[in-house]
Design a protein with these regions (language model features):
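Short hydrophobic beta-strand element within catalytic cores of glycosyltransferases
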Residues: 264-268
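Donor nucleotide-sugar binding/catalytic pocket of nucleotide-sugar-dependent glycosyltransferases
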Residues: 108-155, 159-160, 164-168
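A charged, aromatic-enriched C-terminal amphipathic alpha-helix characteristic of glycosyltransferases
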Residues: 281-317
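Nucleotide-activated donor-binding/catalytic signature segment of Leloir-type glycosyltransferases, i.e.
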Residues: 210-228
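An aromatic- and histidine-rich active-site surface loop
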Residues: 49, 60-80, 178
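Conserved catalytic-core segment of nucleotide-activated headgroup transferases in glycan assembly
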Residues: 149-210
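Aromatic "clamp/platform" in nucleotide-sugar-dependent glycosyltransferases that forms part
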Residues: 247
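A short, histidine- and acid-enriched strand-loop-helix "catalytic/donor-clamping" loop
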Residues: 67, 82-98, 109-112
Length: 317
């Protein structure tokens, strides 16, 4: 028996990202529970420390976007007879042949693979019958307010635009076809031609504004970049609609945070989305039609919380 019931291994902000925010909120909820646990930040503590921590617990829950780390921990936990719960924070089969094969290998030998949508569950259960689908969304415990200068910029943008949208990209990432996953340059092109509609781009890593400058891409004054660390929930709250124009996805944290705030969402239909989302095809024609016809409205607040299902899984194992 290990000293702890659970060893939680993952990355924490900064940098800000869907996985790191999920792990941070998971830890915050564990602090309120009666479960004995140990948290390891794999980026700061290192791989060696993370592997050593496995011996201290009965159940290991790993959060990583690296297919290589997923395979490494799957093999290691199998060899030392530890139960590995492994969350796949993206749509399965989104990589090329090698990485997809490695993902499937780790699914096969993990104790319980956890996926985020129905299409991934169909793939995972064919490989490992213990696979489960659990939402990555855990509601935020607080919203960190924006600084006064940023608030002023947003107010100015809203005063000049009839409708204000927001989108986010934690970094510049590309899909297996070489296209932008977040398709920010396509959004810029669209909003450059819609001066009456505003767009706030959450770019906490600063990588997108760097790319835009390097490529000398023009963006008009109805587009506002926020290229510093901030709470995207504060942006969602102050805009009319959130756009998720991605070429691939998992269980988007941003989509559910917008719905949790009662805000409408326009998103590509490349994965299963919550019922309240306006789903569009992944092309500019569909995006243009959705943005140009959008009228501000309130949606029923999203009430899902993935922590309760995860907690049950921890207790059962």
């Amino acid at each position: 028996m290990g000293k702890y019931k659970l060893i939680l291994i993952g990355s924490f902000p900064p940098p800000v990202g869907g996985v790191s925010i999920h792990v941070k909120r998971l830890k915050e909820n564990l602090e309120k529970s009666n479960l004995s646990y140990l948290v390891v930040d794999i980026k700061r503590d290192g791989l060696k420390t993370a592997l050593k921590s496995v011996f201290k617990g009965n159940v290991v829950h790993l959060h990583t976007s690296s297919v290589y780390l997923k395979c490494c921990f799957s093999i290691f936990c199998l060899l030392v007879n530890k139960k590995l719960l492994l969350t796949y924070h993206g749509n399965l089969n989104r990589y090329g042949q090698l990485k997809n094969s490695l993902d499937k290998f780790s699914i096969k030998i993990a104790h319980v693979p956890i996926v985020l949508n129905r299409s991934s569950l169909e793939i995972a259960t064919r490989i490992n019958r213990k696979s489960v689908q659990i939402s990555a969304f855990i509601p935020p415990s607080e919203i960190i307010e924006l600084d006064n200068e940023t608030i002023k910029k947003i107010k100015d943008l809203k005063s000049r635009c009839s409708v204000t949208f927001c989108t986010n990209a934690y970094n510049v990432s590309y899909d297996k076809s070489g296209g932008e996953i977040y398709q920010i340059t396509a959004l810029i092109e669209l909003f450059n031609g819609m001066p009456e509609r505003g767009l706030i781009i959450s770019d906490p890593s600063g990588m997108y504004i760097k790319l835009i400058k390097e490529k000398d891409i023009h963006y008009s004054d109805n587009i506002l970049f926020l290229s510093f660390i901030h709470d995207f929930n504060a942006i969602i709250r102050d805009t009319d609609c959130m756009i998720r124009f991605t070429s691939t996805d998992g269980d988007s944290l941003s989509v559910k945070e917008a719905l949790f705030a009662g805000k409408p969402v326009i998103a590509t239909n490349i994965v299963e989305r919550p019922a309240a989302v306006t789903c569009i095809d992944n092309n500019m024609h569909a995006l243009t039609a959705a943005v140009s016809s959008f009228k501000p409205h309130f949606v029923e607040n999203y009430t899902e919380n993935g922590f309760s299902e995860l907690y049950r899984l921890y207790c059962e194992n």
